């Protein structure tokens, strides 16, 4: 388009900011160097750690049994593979061989959003042991932060609203408080130690499935 001498020449178009999730994900997935303890005798095994008293190279046998104790399926993995990671293979094999399976009973290590969703979506029931929530030491109990499903917010022990902020890449919805309110909160030391005076509460997008597992735990049938 022609322009007068007094006019400034057109500026080159600004480069559009790329907001595609693939590129963002690629930046997040840059490989990081980490140290792995490996056995020189048997490199295929893994370092099994249980608390602070037990550390040894080992294999784990992830076993599924029926109500009478008969073994239905076993999957062997290195000792550093978590139970919840090995669950899919064991579960898929058992349900393929025994499709009539209705209820899955497991310990608290298997109470993850993914496993809960997988089992209930298959039309089965998952009943797990109690899993203690991870909360700040010496702080408010977890149950004092109440989720309001209708307004999609969290109510703190001081009856203030934590509004939805974002959903992180791990599938957790983050609810954050208003720092202006938290600054003068009488129980802030029991709630958060963040420098910006913001309390963040996370709730997984599949939390409803975990609550179904809790309901099954309180049901005598399971």
Predicted regions: what they are:
Residues 1-222:
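Anion-binding and metal-coordination hotspots
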């Amino acid at each position: 388009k022609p322009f007068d001498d007094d006019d400034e020449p057109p500026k080159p178009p600004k480069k559009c900011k790329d907001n595609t999730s693939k590129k963002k994900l690629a930046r997040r997935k840059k490989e990081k160097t980490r140290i792995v303890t490996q056995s020189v005798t048997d490199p295929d095994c893994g370092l099994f750690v249980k608390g602070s008293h037990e550390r040894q190279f080992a294999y784990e046998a992830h076993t599924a049994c029926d109500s009478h104790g008969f073994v239905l399926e076993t999957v062997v993995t290195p000792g550093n593979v978590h139970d919840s990671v090995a669950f899919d293979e064991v579960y898929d094999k058992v349900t393929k061989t025994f499709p009539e399976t209705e209820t899955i009973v497991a310990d608290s290590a298997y109470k993850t959003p993914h496993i809960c969703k997988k089992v209930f979506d298959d039309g089965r029931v998952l009943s797990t042991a109690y899993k203690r929530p991870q909360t700040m030491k010496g702080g408010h109990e977890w149950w004092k932060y109440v989720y309001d499903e209708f307004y999609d917010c969290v109510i703190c022990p001081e009856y203030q609203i934590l509004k939805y902020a974002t959903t992180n890449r791990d599938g957790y919805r983050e609810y954050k408080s208003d720092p202006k309110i938290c600054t003068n909160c009488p129980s802030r030391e029991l709630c958060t130690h963040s420098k910006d005076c913001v309390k963040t509460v996370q709730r997984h997008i599949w939390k409803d499935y975990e609550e179904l597992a809790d309901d099954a735990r309180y049901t005598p049938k399971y």
